[in-house]
């Protein structure tokens, strides 16, 4: 445990941010998984709908600093390629 007052505060802040980031990342993984399941099933309409929602979540996570902007772009590109293969 830290003895310095500012470090005690940082520990609290970091823990809150860690939990928030964990929640966002979990939501992202779920969205990507549901998109991939729809794409694998060949359901193009549902996959298109999920692609828009997943892209939005990726952009929001990147803007909040949860994931890097390049990682969001790479994932969006991979999802777009997957939908084009259907």
From Swiss-Prot:
Keywords: Ribonucleoprotein, Ribosomal protein, RNA-binding, rRNA-binding. Pfam families: Ribosomal_S20p. Gene3D superfamilies: Ribosomal protein S20. GO terms for cellular component: cytosol; small ribosomal subunit. Transmembrane segments: none annotated. InterPro entries: Ribosomal_bS20, Ribosomal_bS20_sf. One of its GO terms (molecular function) is structural constituent of ribosome. GO terms for biological process: translation. Coiled coil: none annotated. Binds directly to 16S ribosomal RNA. NCBIfam families: S20. Belongs to the bacterial ribosomal protein bS20 family. This is Small ribosomal subunit protein bS20.
């Amino acid at each position: 445990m830290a003895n310095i007052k500012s470090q005690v505060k940082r520990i609290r802040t970091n823990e809150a941010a860690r939990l928030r980031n964990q929640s966002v990342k979990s939501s992202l993984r779920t969205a990507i998984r549901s998109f991939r399941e729809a794409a694998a099933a060949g359901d193009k309409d549902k996959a298109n709908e999920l692609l828009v929602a997943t892209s939005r979540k990726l952009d929001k996570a990147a803007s909040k600093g949860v994931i890097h902007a390049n990682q969001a772009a790479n994932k969006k590109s991979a999802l777009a390629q997957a939908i084009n293969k259907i």
